[in-house]
């Protein structure tokens, strides 16, 4: 893992709303409308959080056709995040 990846993942996980989005998407993939409704937030706010999670490689999305309409479905990716002094040391020694 590279330093930038650790920073992106840490930043993505530092917000309680994003952690809740991961919790919801771990149970079941959802579109942005469903997430916004469940979180009681606007779609633009949820979208901004999803972009941060996608950038950290914690969430992925697929475009799915439903009738004549396309919907983007978001799902949580499998990940493990662990950091300790030894990992931090290796991050900077491998630059």
From Swiss-Prot:
It comes from the Archaea. It holds the Pfam family HTH_5. SUPFAM superfamilies: Winged helix' DNA-binding domain (SSF46785). Keywords: DNA-binding, Transcription, Transcription regulation. One of its GO terms (molecular function) is DNA-binding transcription factor activity. This is Uncharacterized HTH-type transcriptional regulator MJ0229. It comes from Methanocaldococcus jannaschii (strain ATCC 43067 / DSM 2661 / JAL-1 / JCM 10045 / NBRC 100440).
């Amino acid at each position: 893992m590279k330093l930038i990846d650790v920073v992106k993942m840490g930043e993505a996980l530092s917000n309680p709303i994003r952690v809740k989005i991961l919790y919801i998407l771990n149970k079941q993939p959802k579109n942005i409308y469903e997430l916004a409704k469940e979180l009681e937030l606007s779609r633009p706010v949820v979208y901004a959080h999803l972009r941060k999670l996608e950038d950290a490689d914690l969430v992925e999305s697929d475009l799915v056709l439903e009738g004549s309409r396309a919907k983007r479905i978001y799902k949580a990716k499998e990940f493990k995040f662990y950091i300790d002094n030894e990992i931090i040391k290796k991050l900077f020694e491998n630059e």
